């Protein structure tokens, strides 16, 4: 059910809801019905959401007494080609979240920029640039070919987070949600290179276990970022850049990881990738081998829960 309430006195003659599911071929238009409520004109209508779990984007289109039209989205009143739609999430209401979720304060940490527990660490890979000046401006401008490598690191690590546990508890934090900590070759680490190991700049797997154990003493749970819809191209699974030897999915048609990805010449880079970013090849999420790797006994989720994680936020 949607309701649009124009400013009092606005010369609106018609109001429509425009909605578009992520898997829909075109926009759906719903004309909203005007009504007087407390001396104010409001427009109401019903939009039937898709049956499947997906995202739906929507905004409003207004017709004016002078014959013109405008759109209204989260960026306000604007032209059609400038509107920023709102997002509606269609979810499965039988899906259950952990009982503890939502019952306390969750604090999000971007590990590289939070706290450096071990100062002046050597870079574990030669293509990483260390920012010794913690007040320096991050690299944000594109390189000579228009790309962003996200290769500058400020050195935040797991020991730094552990050092701040008393401070976080004092603030009333109950859960720490960490942006990705797995080995990856960018400072944001959403391009996973190795799901089973902490990025060496952040520390070791043992450091993570210690962090979780110490956090529990303060009544704090550690929630990890589970980035399972895609990997990095620079990973031990895809290995386009060759950092991990001569094999793996991109280089070897017989690789056990090959079926995880969708290789096809119709894609710009020869494989399906997240929003067309060549460094983020998408995985076939229902591939049995991949599902077993992520969710099976001894797999990714099982491994990190055993190491002490309280749960996962799924990307």
Predicted segments, located by residue:
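Glycine/serine-rich loop-strand microenvironments at binding/catalytic pocket rims
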Residues: 45, 55, 59-61, 298-312
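Substrate-binding/active-site clefts of carbohydrate-active enzymes
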Residues: 110-174, 181-307
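Glycan-association/targeting regions that enable binding to alpha-glucans and other polysaccharides
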Residues: 1-108, 116
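Residue-level recognition of beta-strand->loop/alpha-helix junctions
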Residues: 177-180, 315
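Short, charged/polar micro-motifs that form catalytic or ligand-binding hotspots
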Residues: 46-51, 96, 151, 158, ...
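Short catalytic-loop micro-motif centered on adjacent basic/acidic residues
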Residues: 223, 311-315
């Amino acid at each position: 059910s949607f309701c649009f309430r124009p400013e009092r006195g606005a010369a609106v003659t018609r109001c429509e809801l425009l909605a578009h599911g992520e898997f829909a071929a075109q926009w759906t238009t719903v004309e909203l019905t005007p009504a007087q409520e407390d001396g104010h004109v409001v427009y109401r209508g019903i939009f039937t959401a898709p049956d499947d779990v997906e995202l739906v984007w929507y905004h409003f289109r207004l017709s004016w007494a002078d014959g013109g039209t405008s759109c209204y989205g989260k960026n306000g009143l604007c032209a059609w080609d400038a509107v920023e739609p709102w997002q509606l999430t269609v979810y499965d209401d039988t899906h259950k979240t952990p009982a503890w979720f939502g019952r306390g304060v969750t604090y999000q940490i971007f590990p590289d920029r939070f706290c450096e527990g071990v100062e002046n660490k050597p870079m574990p890979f030669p293509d990483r640039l260390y920012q010794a000046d913690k007040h320096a401006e991050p690299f944000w401008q594109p390189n000579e070919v228009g790309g962003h490598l996200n290769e500058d690191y400020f050195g935040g690590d797991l020991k730094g987070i552990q050092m701040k546990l008393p401070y976080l508890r004092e603030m009333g934090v109950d859960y720490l949600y960490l942006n990705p900590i797995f080995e990856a070759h960018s400072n944001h680490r959403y391009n996973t290179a190795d799901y089973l190991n902490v990025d060496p700049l952040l520390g070791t797997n043992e450091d993570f276990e210690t962090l979780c154990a110490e956090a529990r003493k303060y009544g704090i749970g550690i929630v990890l970022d589970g980035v399972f819809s895609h990997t990095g191209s620079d990973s031990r699974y895809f290995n386009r850049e060759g950092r991990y030897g001569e094999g793996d999915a991109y280089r070897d048609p017989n690789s056990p990881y090959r079926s995880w990805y969708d290789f096809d010449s119709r894609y710009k880079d020869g494989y399906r990738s997240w929003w067309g970013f060549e460094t983020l090849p998408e995985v076939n999420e229902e591939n049995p081998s991949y599902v077993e790797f992520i969710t099976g006994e001894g797999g990714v989720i099982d491994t990190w829960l055993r190491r002490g994680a309280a749960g996962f936020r799924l990307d």
